[in-house]
Amino acid sequence: GGVLKDTIQMIHGPLGCAYDTWHTKRYPTDNGHFNMKYVWSTDMKESHVVFGGEKRLEKSMHEAFDEMPDIKRMIVYTTCPTALIGDDIKAVAKKVMKDRPDVDVFTVECPGFSGVSQSKGHHVLNIGWINEKVETMEKEITSEYTMNFIGDFNIQGDTQLLQTYWDRLGIQVVAHFTGNGTYDDLRCMHQAQLNVVNCARSSGYIANELKKRYGIPRLDIDSWGFNYMAEGIRKICAFFGIEEKGEELIAEEYAKWKPKLDWYK
């Protein structure tokens, strides 16, 4: 979630729990890197753990929206302490949304002890999102070819580079999950004709659910490396029946980069 460019990421727990966030990664965005500039935490103290942290969370959510008046979307995460004391973050989120009708909040209840690996957190967010948020919004479709690009997080700007390829092919990306993406675009994932998965470990779950619930096919690619990327472009173009466009794009990119690649030989 921390890669989204228009969303407050609220970590409900002690300040230290907010350390391992997008600030340890390289997730730029095309709106001035909003997601990399700020860390939000409820900064729970011992008294909040003893007496409950729900009021602290509610106050922090309102403060964040007040400080960021242009931002209307938020994801709230539990941590080990807030999960152990049983804070009902979903109830708090509903109350804040009632108080602020123009905002939308998603909650992720996956404290660190939930699973043996990071993948558990991916699974909880993937399934929670499709259960609660997908198909709660519709966007304008401007192309006869549409897809979701899933499991790419714009590390060092790769999502933005790949977007130039999709634009040249005439493919509309309904939603990026989640590199350089937006909260509301992800609510429209049901509108795509194809789910292209780049990182299956983190995001294959939601692609599988979209196929099960909406009949959207899943296509796995690997975008790292010239030959792998060319293979991925061919697979996507074959699905849409635009193979000629794909070959033109691949030829243009090879011609552009071949002299530099040859240097390494």
Swiss-Prot record:
Its EC number is 1.18.6.1. Signal peptide: none annotated. It holds the Pfam family Oxidored_nitro. It catalyses: N2 + 8 reduced [2Fe-2S]-[ferredoxin] + 16 ATP + 16 H2O = H2 + 8 oxidized [2Fe-2S]-[ferredoxin] + 2 NH4(+) + 16 ADP + 16 phosphate + 6 H(+). Binds 1 [8Fe-7S] cluster per heterodimer. Binds 1 [7Fe-V-9S-C-homocitryl] cluster per subunit. It comes from the Bacteria. [8Fe-7S] cluster binds at C17, C80. GO terms for biological process: nitrogen fixation. [7Fe-V-9S-C-homocitryl] cluster binds at C199. PROSITE patterns: NITROGENASE_1_1, NITROGENASE_1_2. GO terms for molecular function: ATP binding; iron-sulfur cluster binding; metal ion binding; nitrogenase activity. Its cofactor is [8Fe-7S] cluster; [7Fe-V-9S-C-homocitryl] cluster. Keywords: ATP-binding, Iron, Iron-sulfur, Metal-binding, Nitrogen fixation, Nucleotide-binding, Oxidoreductase, Vanadium. This vanadium-iron protein is part of the nitrogenase complex that catalyzes the key enzymatic reactions in nitrogen fixation. Belongs to the NifD/NifK/NifE/NifN family. Hexamer of two alpha, two beta, and two delta chains. The structure of the 7Fe-V-9S-C-homocitryl cluster is assumed to be analogous to the 7Fe-Mo-9S-C-homocitryl cluster. This is Nitrogenase vanadium-iron protein alpha chain. It comes from Azorhizophilus paspali (Azotobacter paspali). The lineage of its organism: Bacteria, Pseudomonadati, Pseudomonadota, Gammaproteobacteria, Pseudomonadales.
